[in-house]
Regions:
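Juxtamembrane/transmembrane-helix boundary motifs in multi-pass membrane proteins
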Residues: 16-20, 62-65, 99, 103, ...
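Hydrophobic alpha-helical transmembrane segments of polytopic
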Residues: 24-28, 67, 164-167, 171
């Protein structure tokens, strides 16, 4: 984070969300899931909250839907991140029972991501997500309490941001292969 790698990843994630806004209910949890997988902590999801809210509002979708799915997705991803303490601990418990680290990572990645996407599908199909029909939002909008969209935030990246992400990913790969 100090080298600017997280800012770089958030910038990429924001571009993904803004380039496909109508799929916010699926992309928001996907983005937070993979940020957590890469970082090993769910705190990375906090940096995505303002972007998710803006994109959802721009698509006339209640922000609570993609936000809640995204936050849950980031927390579930901790159980599949090769660099999280939870995975290291569970691997230590399960390896004596015959489960290898690569097998567990593969299993946890597939099942946790599938669960997140299934949840996003259920919310998208069965929840009332139309923001224009939300009386509380419409009242706040009429009172001028809703902030206008600020658009893409191109934050100046630190010089070593991209390199720090590359080095970190190589480290994660080495951990996986070890």
């Amino acid at each position: 984070q100090l080298a600017g790698g997280l800012d770089y990843l958030v910038q990429i994630a924001e571009r993904i969300l803004r380039s496909n806004p109508k799929y916010i209910n699926f992309l928001a949890p996907t983005v937070t899931y993979f940020l957590t997988i890469l970082a090993g902590t769910g705190h990375t999801a906090f940096s995505m909250i303002p972007v998710i809210v803006e994109v959802a509002k721009e698509q006339n979708i209640k922000p609570s839907a993609p936000l809640s799915i995204a936050v849950v997705s980031s927390q579930i991803a901790i159980t599949a991140s090769p660099v999280s303490a939870a995975v290291v601990y569970m691997t230590g418990v399960l390896e004596p029972l015959g489960w290898s680290y690569p097998t567990l990572i593969g299993l946890w990645l597939v099942t946790t991501f599938a669960g997140c996407m299934l949840t996003a599908l259920i919310i998208t199909l069965f929840a009332n997500l139309d923001l224009s029909k939300d009386p509380v939002y419409q009242e706040r909008l009429a009172q001028g309490l809703v902030k206008p969209s600020t658009g893409v935030q191109n934050k100046e990246l630190k010089p070593g941001a991209k390199l720090s992400v590359a080095i970190f990913l190589i480290g994660v790969l080495l951990v996986l292969l070890y």
